[in-house]
Amino acid sequence: MPHIPVPAAELNTRLDRLRCAMTEKDPAWSMLLLDNTLDMYYFTGTMQDGALVVTPDQATLFVRRSFDVAKDESAFADIRPMGSFRGIKEVYPDIPETVYVAAKAMTLQKLSMLNKHLPFAPKPMDGVLSGLRSVKSAYELDCMRESGRLHRYVIEGLAPAFLREGVSEARLCSEICTAIVDRGGMGISRYNQPAAEDVLGIASFSENSLRPTALDSPSGCVGTSTAMKSIGSSERTLHEGDTILLDIPCGWRGYHTDKSITFYYGELDKHPQSGVIRAAREQCITLENETASLLRAG
């Protein structure tokens, strides 16, 4: 059931942790304002056009669009409709000189719109936000584990059956992602970067998997066009002897797992470099296991 709301207790705990972290950062802090949808979802369980205002003793989600949807899907305690940012000042008449914001996500245009009604100097709180989100609650870990279970089932269990002579990169990627969405997946993944959303992922065959992209990733892709370096080519089709790189994430209720996997299409023993390919695979497995052994809390 992917549409189950984030529990109220979970949202309350996050708000308490936010206030504690802000007090540790600045004992004199008096207000913070978050306007981007990712922060809004984390603290309120809904993604709307609006702003979340938090003080040491009060928190209000102001929603321009859509207030009705926000009330329907969020367990956040105080959600109010907002015509413009002037509405914030009606609830919080004493706007402090300094207000903490997510500087990485707030645009100059949005800041100008806010300052038209709320004259304040912005101060960044990005470190606080990333620190809070880096420590997962039991609820968040459960979401990630469910994403991982779904991810593994589709990528490792179903994907090999989708490999067939003549299928294009784009078609293969879309079929795999459809299988994820059909089973409750989000159909999108998000990164901690401005405007960083990936609708599907990538499927790349042989030489295309070595094609560099602007994304901070080792996976290569020619994309659907020069304007879209993702998903894969609708022209490059699969043939015997190709390698298939799948770098397709999975999301569940706002939480993600990421995995890359490479398949070989055909009889590997017939490939002139079969020994090199097998050795490369074993080396990858060794590196993966060594890396996993280094992981520890903190």
What annotation goes with each model-predicted range?
Residues 1-298:
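Active-site neighborhoods and metal-handling regions in enzymes and metal-associated proteins
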